[in-house]
Curated annotation (Swiss-Prot):
Family as reported in the entry's similarity comment: Belongs to the NPY family.
Location, primary (coarse class): secreted
Organism name: Rhodnius prolixus
Residues modified to Phenylalanine amide: 11
Subcellular location(s) per record: Secreted
Entry GO terms, CC: extracellular region
UniProt KW keywords: Amidation, Neuropeptide, Secreted
Endoplasmic reticulum as UniProt keyword: no
Its biological purpose: Neuropeptide.
Name of the protein in its database record: Short neuropeptide F
GO terms, biological process: neuropeptide signaling pathway
């Protein structure tokens, strides 16, 4: 899942 809050980018 690219929309993971762990990444917090712009997805």
């Amino acid at each position: 899942n690219n929309r993971s809050p762990q990444l917090r980018l712009r997805f």
